[in-house]
Amino acid sequence: MTFLQRLQGLADNKICAFAWFVVRRFDEERVPQAAASMTFTTLLALVPVLTVMVAVASIFPVFDRWSDSFVSFVNQTIVPQGADMVFDYINAFREQANRLTAIGSVMLVVTSLMLIRTIDNTFNRIWRVNSQRPWMMQFLVYWALLTFGPLSLGVGISFMVGSVQDAALASGAPQWSGALRTAATLTFMTLLLWGLYRFVPNRFVPARQAFVGALATAFCLETARSLFTWYMGNFDGYRSIYGAFAAVPFFLLWLNLLWTLVLGGAVLTSSLSYWQGEAFRRGFDSRGRFDDVLKILLLLDAAQKEGKALPVQEFRRHINMGYDELGELLEKLARHGYIYSGRQGWVLKTGADSIELNELFKLFVYRPLPVERDHVNQAVDAVMMPCLQTLNMTLAEFDAQAKKQQQS
């Protein structure tokens, strides 16, 4: 077997082709640049976020111990071994932040919300979301992520760590305590990432796909942390150069790696919807989008006749495309008044006999320029005019014609 034949075999393999698709999306979304930006934002907002979380916990004394568990979890996750000095400084800054005035406290909250908003915008860009949540809904999501999310995680970590220690002592094998604690940390890291991937993007993300992406990312994070700790313990080049300040570059490198893995997990999660039906192999040209738009509208027309709305999952069962691409088409149709999103799902705004195919073609494939045009524009218009005239029919007429051709 020649090298080209082996290469073609890899391209035909579903797993290899999907992996290459994920790598391409990783590059298209410019994840390393986004991770660098998130690293800088985290440096500015980490202390305010921890301060706001602990301040909220102090309102309810019962949460004090659980908030400490979350801070400890952040220490283990964000600050690698060898950079412990950084977290000592963070704790010192957080304690000093408690002495701020009312205006200073407001600025802490604003800075914290800015970090959450940056995460939200980055995730929405990865899922290719063009429409934002309403302002009030955004605020509620941000506040929940900033307060109740960490507190819930702290509650879970406290119970899990306590159960692990009790189980290890009861079994007479305390040496297993470290492994069980790592498993507990991995579990809650997976839950935290699952919540981020499932609820932060303003896009439908299946729970199972969010879990797969979160689990893979959590394993990568735990492996990276172990390798990072091993490297810092065996190679002390930074220490010989920076001395006591070696913790700072270690911390920056780890933060950048952390965000690269988290955003890479988001890219993987958003790509998983293309696995079914090997949708990752299809091209994303204008003709394909126009065909998909017609399928969407025909499905909504059939649902309208039955008096029901269609959830996003229903479209995916009939159209071989990813949820992010599907969401883009639905949002564009909604912006131009063809459909709208209700509580039960998507609904057609008008009847199929009122939707002109040539208008859809102009919207998704080719729209003649309304302003002054040169000879090239005029020539293209002359070539496209017969096509637009052929498409001078309604969606209902097209549906009848398609069914007639299918029967013949």
Curated annotation (Swiss-Prot):
**Keywords of this protein's UniProt record, alphabetized?**
Cell inner membrane, Cell membrane, Membrane, Transmembrane, Transmembrane helix
A single GO cellular-component term from the record reads: plasma membrane
Q: Does the keyword Cytoplasm apply?
A: no
What start-end ranges are recorded for coiled-coil regions in this protein? Answer: none
Q: Where are the transmembrane segments?
A: 43-63, 100-120, 139-159, 176-196, 210-230, 248-268
Topologically, how does it sit relative to the membrane? Multi-pass membrane protein
Q: Which cysteines are joined by disulfide bonds?
A: none
Could you tell me where this protein is found in the cell? Cell inner membrane
Kindly give the NCBIfam families that the UniProt entry links to this protein: PRK04214.1, yihY_not_rbn
What family does the Swiss-Prot or TrEMBL record give for this protein? Belongs to the UPF0761 family.
**HAMAP family for this protein:** UPF0761 (MF_00672)
For this entry, the protein name equals: UPF0761 membrane protein NMCC_0461
Q: Which organism is it from?
A: Neisseria meningitidis serogroup C (strain 053442)
